[in-house]
Regions:
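Short loop/turn motifs at secondary-structure junctions
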Residues: 11-13, 94, 131
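Glycine-/charge-enriched secondary-structure boundary and capping motifs
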Residues: 31, 35-49, 54, 58-71, ...
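Small-aliphatic-rich amphipathic alpha-helix that forms the alpha element of a beta-alpha
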Residues: 1-17, 38-48, 122-125, 146
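Glycine-rich anion-binding loops of enzyme active sites
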Residues: 16-103
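A glycine- and small/hydrophobic-rich beta-loop-beta segment
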Residues: 92, 100-103, 108-135
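Glycine- and acidic
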Residues: 17-29, 108, 128-133, 173
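A general structural motif
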Residues: 76-82, 113-120, 159-164
Length: 176
């Protein structure tokens, strides 16, 4: 949620979270553990970023007969921003340069909060200075997804030099 807010031109520092929870019907310790661990993880990140949650909605009865919804906690980021500072993800014109502001998780696969804060501050400053005209927060499809979605908007292609083994790495927290 934070990287999407930043990629659109806003600062994460005044952002607020809202959550949507989808979990199976709670019937035993294991089923109760899924939302508990997800919410504890969300709380940990809220504390580390110093950002509150303003609410959310739960769907804890995501079971129909023997079919359970996949367990998921979806985070939304909400903030205000000067409309003149908002950017969109598509490449604007031929000759745009693409730069990856990469987040590297810690060895235990947790986010490197210090690195994220520094990266997001830098991206926000560059958007305000109008040095960044397009932004995309990497997710499940990694760099490959980001490049495709950014180039489809105005029918522009992109030529990149990158290790093809890493094109589909998740890249959560990174911004192109």
């Amino acid at each position: 949620a934070c990287s999407k807010v930043v990629a659109a031109g806003a600062s994460y520092e005044k952002m607020r979270f809202s959550y949507q929870e989808y979990f199976e019907r709670m019937t035993d310790r294991k089923s109760w553990g899924k939302p508990l661990s997800a919410l504890l993880g969300a709380l940990k990140m809220q504390v580390e970023f110093g950002l509150p949650s303003i609410g959310g909605k739960d769907s804890m009865s995501g079971t129909f007969e023997n079919i359970n919804v996949p367990p998921m906690l979806m985070a939304f980021g909400i903030t205000t921003v000067d409309a003149g500072q908002v950017i969109s993800p598509e490449l604007k014109y031929e000759g745009n340069k693409l730069y990856l502001i990469k987040h590297t998780p810690l060895e235990n696969h947790m986010p490197d909060v210090g690195q994220l804060k520094a990266n997001w501050k830098y991206v926000h400053e560059q958007i305000q200075a109008e040095n960044i005209v397009s932004g995309y927060a990497l997710g499940f499809g990694g760099l490959a997804e980001a490049i495709c979605k950014m180039s489809f908007g105005n029918g522009l292609d992109a030529r990149i030099t990158y290790d093809e083994k890493e094109l589909f790495n998740y890249g959560y927290g990174s911004i192109l």
